[in-house]
Swiss-Prot record:
Function: Flagellin is the subunit protein which polymerizes to form the filaments of bacterial flagella.
Subunit details: In C.crescentus, the flagellar filament is composed of multiple flagellins of 29 kDa; 27 kDa and 25 kDa.
Gene3D superfamilies: f41 fragment of flagellin, N-terminal domain
Family assignment from sequence similarity: Belongs to the bacterial flagellin family.
This protein's name: Flagellin FljM
UniProt KW keywords: Bacterial flagellum, Secreted
Top-level division of the source organism's lineage: Bacteria
Main location: secreted
Stored SUPFAM superfamilies: Phase 1 flagellin
Transmembrane regions: none
Pfam families in the record: Flagellin_C, Flagellin_N
Location(s), subcellular: Secreted; Bacterial flagellum
GO molecular function, one term: structural molecule activity
Length: 273
């Protein structure tokens, strides 16, 4: 049987406990809605918070990986552009050498062709030396390979350099001809240089494709990590909004229950009137 006491109002105490519990839940839900997160700190859930922090750090480090790979892309793109120019120049050099091999040419015409040939040769040197991105080149013979970040653990994506200088193509700074016979011989030399250049460019193209593929993978991996972190810590706002309305109603009822419980002491007084 319930005990009526003016010293202890157990009904009010229970109502107050329930109201405090509701208020605590309400504060938590409001915080989740305000921040958009169900796990905002280690005290919310230490294990999940730690996992989310680690995954978030890994996802963040992927930005450095993407930056490095994009530099790699640009470095290769510059080398490929220079290579296109160089193969065009070699084609024109072959044309000049072929024309100069004509024994029916007069001296003036021969010398003009030789001058054009020499000028085209020198342009190859300029094209190769200017094939730099951010001061780095894989076409000018200054390096054998370049390594770019491949993952957050520091592993590398390595690109083998392809020298497109005159020396790298089997030519020299003095490669030329002084007779029609020498011009004819030069045709074969240029053909070899052209084949060498196209082979090197094909290899760079393969490296570029591989780098592009890996960059796409890194982007998808970063997106997956971000999504995973979101699944761990992000709040379901639709669910929290519905819960907020429910708790607000519960809070109002709790206030009324506490008010009713507090009135029980007054009802005891009426027994003595």
């Amino acid at each position: 049987m319930a005990l009526n006491s003016i010293n202890t109002n157990s009904g009010a105490l229970i109502a107050l406990q329930n109201l405090n519990s509701t208020n605590a839940e309400l504060t938590q839900v409001q915080q989740r809605i305000n921040t958009g997160k169900k796990i905002g700190s280690a005290k919310d859930n230490g294990a999940i918070w730690a996992t989310a922090k680690n995954q978030s750090a890994t996802a963040g480090s992927m930005n450095a990986v993407k930056d490095s790979l994009q530099r790699g892309q640009s470095t290769i793109d510059v080398a490929l552009a220079a290579g296109d120019t160089i193969t065009d120049l070699l084609g024109k050099m072959k044309e000049k050498a072929l024309a100069a091999s004509d024994t029916s040419l007069n001296t003036a015409s021969f010398n003009a062709l030789k001058s054009d040939f020499d000028s085209l040769r020198d342009q190859i040197t300029k094209a190769a030396s200017n094939a730099k991105f951010n001061g780095v080149s894989i076409a000018d013979g200054t390096t054998t390979k370049l390594s770019f970040l491949a993952n957050s653990d520091g592993s590398a994506f390595t690109v083998t350099a392809k020298t497109l200088t005159l020396g790298g193509l089997g030519l020299t700074a003095t490669s030329s001809f002084t007779t029609a016979a020498a011009a004819k011989t030069m045709i074969g030399t240029i053909d070899t240089a052209l084949q060498t250049a196209t082979n090197k460019l094909a290899s760079l193209g393969t490296s570029s494709t591989g780098l592009d593929t890996h960059l796409t993978f890194v982007g998808k991996l970063q997106d997956s990590l971000d999504a995973g972190v979101g699944n761990l810590v992000d709040a379901d706002l639709a669910k929290e909004s519905a819960k907020l309305q429910s708790l607000q109603t519960k809070q109002q009822l709790g206030v009324q229950a506490l008010s009713i419980a507090n009135q029980s002491s007054s009802s005891i007084l009426s027994l003595f009137r």
